């Protein structure tokens, strides 16, 4: 197993997160999302500017997983909730958690979730939300194993002109 290091991302990591975010999004969804729309989506929502804004926001936090040679292979984002269901003040959202395929199933996703949950608890959050693509059964199984449950609420996720359904899940941290 390749040794990896998990650390808190800093503003200087925006370009690394941008590349990693784009790569993992394309890898995860290229099988059922239109190509041109995916490229445009990555250019907008995985741009260096997008990550610079996120990393500059004190309400947000990010973690990056790297090899010994500092190559980024995974990341997670914690943000205020932007979900289409009722939330309480102080609740937070696990906005993104992705690993490059060769680094999945080695316990690193668990380490990323543990880092996010520890920070959410330190901030006093009682609930941690996330959105998961309704067709992503593997992610749903992973989240269920780690205490998240489907709220029954849905929201649409657009890539270009195509809408996809996300399920809103929550974990009680109290």
Regions inferred by a protein language model and the residue ranges of each:
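Acetyl-CoA-dependent GNAT
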Residues: 4, 8-14, 18-32, 37-102, ...
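C-terminal "cap" of GNAT-fold acetyltransferases
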Residues: 63, 88-92, 126-129, 133-149, ...
């Amino acid at each position: 197993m390749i040794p990896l290091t998990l650390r808190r991302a800093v503003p200087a990591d925006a370009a690394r997160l941008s590349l990693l975010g784009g790569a993992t999004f394309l890898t995860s969804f290229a099988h059922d999302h239109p190509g041109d729309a995916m490229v445009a989506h990555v250019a907008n929502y995985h741009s260096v500017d997008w990550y610079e804004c996120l990393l500059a926001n004190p309400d947000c936090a990010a973690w990056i997983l790297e090899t010994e040679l500092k190559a980024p292979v995974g990341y997670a984002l914690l943000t205020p909730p932007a979900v289409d269901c009722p939330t309480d003040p102080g609740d937070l959202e696990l906005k993104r958690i992705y690993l490059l395929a060769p680094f999945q199933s080695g316990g690193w996703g668990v380490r990323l979730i543990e880092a996010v949950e520890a920070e959410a608890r330190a901030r006093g959050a009682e609930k941690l939300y996330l959105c998961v693509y309704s067709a992503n059964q593997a992610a749903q199984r992973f989240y269920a194993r780690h205490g998240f449950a489907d709220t029954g609420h849905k929201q649409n996720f657009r890539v270009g002109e195509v809408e996809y359904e996300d399920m809103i899940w929550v974990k009680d941290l109290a």
